[in-house]
Design a protein with these regions (language model features):
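Short, glycine-/small-residue-rich phosphate/pyrophosphate-handling segment
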Residues: 121-168
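N-terminal beta1-alpha1-beta2 submodule of the flavodoxin-like/Rossmannoid cofactor-binding fold
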Residues: 1-91, 95, 100-115, 202-218
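Conserved nucleotide-sugar donor-interacting segment of glycosyltransferase catalytic cores
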Residues: 106-125, 135
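A short, flexible beta-alpha/helix-coil linker loop
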Residues: 10-13, 139-142, 179
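Residues at the starts of beta-strands that form the adenosine-phosphate
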Residues: 3, 38, 130-131, 170
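Short, internal active-site loops enriched in acidic
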Residues: 43-50, 140, 178-181
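Structural beta-sheet core signal
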Residues: 6, 93, 132-136, 173
Length: 218
């Protein structure tokens, strides 16, 4: 029975968020293949992870058996979140671009889950090799050749922290662009391109969810 770790981070609710709708397409396809499977779901906007504090940060560099009671209590959440990543067979993350970077709630989650010598910074990180799908929606266009190409920080950062130099996950990005075109004056000429990008994102999410679920079921 495969386990999916699903994180949503959009500040917008279902129906108003492109990243949430696309992760939902992935999950629907996944669950169709694994109706009895397990999904670990965290809505980091509705139930945010607190920012990492000093005691918990230091505890990450100390063997658990040597923790003080204060360090053990502070590290408990980090251990829980890292364990959720380790238990998952696949990871799904909705990561919309906010002010040219990832949502702060996702950064807080990463700060807790990056445990050096365990999930990261180890010869073989504890979740290495697992497939991760990131829905990196954005209101504008930041692809190669666009005027704001140099403002693209989301994909390079997540590739580093989730990929070979971090958790060691096998990361694939789905990038719905121009999500603000239908509501932003001056972007009217981009509406059809935005719709096409959204359609492609849903199709990619459904295909990816189905394929990964089928592979893990084999």
């Amino acid at each position: 029975m495969a386990t999916l770790l699903h994180l949503d981070t959009s500040v917008h609710p279902d129906g108003a968020s492109v990243s949430r709708s696309v992760t939902a397409s992935f999950r629907e396809a996944w669950e169709a293949q694994h109706p009895d499977g397990k999904v670990i779901y965290r809505d980091l906007n509705a139930d945010p992870i607190p920012h990492l504090q000093g005691v918990a940060a230091v505890a990450g560099f100390i063997p658990p058996q040597n923790h003080t009671p204060e360090q053990a209590a502070a590290f408990a959440l980090r251990d829980q979140l890292a364990t959720e990543l380790e238990q998952a067979d696949a990871v799904l993350i909705g990561a919309p671009m906010y002010n040219y970077t990832i949502p702060s709630t996702l950064k807080a989650w990463l700060d807790h889950v990056i445990v050096m010598g365990r999930t990261s910074g180890a010869e073989t990180p504890s979740a290495a090799g697992k497939p991760a799908t990131v829905v990196a929606s954005r209101g504008g266009g930041y692809g190669p050749g666009t005027p704001r190409e140099s403002f693209e920080f989301v994909l390079p950062y997540l590739e580093k922290v989730l990929g070979a130099e971090g958790f060691g996950l096998d990361v694939e990005f789905i990038v719905p662009e121009l999500t603000l075109a239908e509501t932003t004056p001056g972007m009217e000429h981009l509406v059809e391109i935005a719709k096409a990008s959204r359609t492609q994102a849903h199709e990619a999410a459904q295909s990816r969810g189905k394929a990964l679920a089928a592979h893990l079921a084999a």
